[in-house]
């Protein structure tokens, strides 16, 4: 392999490495509670049943998170107990029980779009509600 071919190959590899690193780093941005506060919906796949939630930026000390409002009882169809709070994480949004234990971690897929894969192959999707 010629020197110029080796150099060209190395440049391509480095470009791929840096672009992958940049996209991975951008997906691990820790958003603040105030950035995420607002109205959200959670549903399984495209099922008609939708849970309407409100992520609030007021702290819930015993859960080490922020207040979760709306129809939280609706979430018990997928969770072992009703979540009391939430918190932003570098990977997404965690729904928490009263003591702060994470019940579900929804991974960030894009702006206002968070998802988790269920054991049965279904997917839960949390989306920012549009006004």
From Swiss-Prot:
Molecular function terms from GO: metalloendopeptidase inhibitor activity
Record's signal peptide: 1-26
Give the Gene3D superfamilies listed for this entry.
Answer: 2.40.128.10
InterPro entries documented for this protein: Inh, Inh/Omp19, Protease_inh_b-brl_dom
S-S bonds: 51-74
Subcellular localization is given as: Periplasm
Pfam families referenced in this protein's UniProt entry, alphabetically: Inh
UniProt cross-references to SUPFAM superfamilies, sorted A to Z: beta-Barrel protease inhibitors
Q: Which UniProt keywords apply?
A: Disulfide bond, Metalloenzyme inhibitor, Metalloprotease inhibitor, Periplasm, Protease inhibitor, Signal
Main location group: periplasm
Cellular component, GO, one term: periplasmic space
The text of the family note is: Belongs to the protease inhibitor I38 family.
Q: What does this protein do?
A: Inhibitor of the alkaline protease. It forms a non-covalent bond with the protease and may prevent its autocatalytic cleavage in the periplasm.
Its name, as the record gives it, is Proteinase inhibitor
Q: Which organism is it from?
A: Pseudomonas aeruginosa (strain ATCC 15692 / DSM 22644 / CIP 104116 / JCM 14847 / LMG 12228 / 1C / PRS 101 / PAO1)
Q: Which gene encodes it?
A: inh
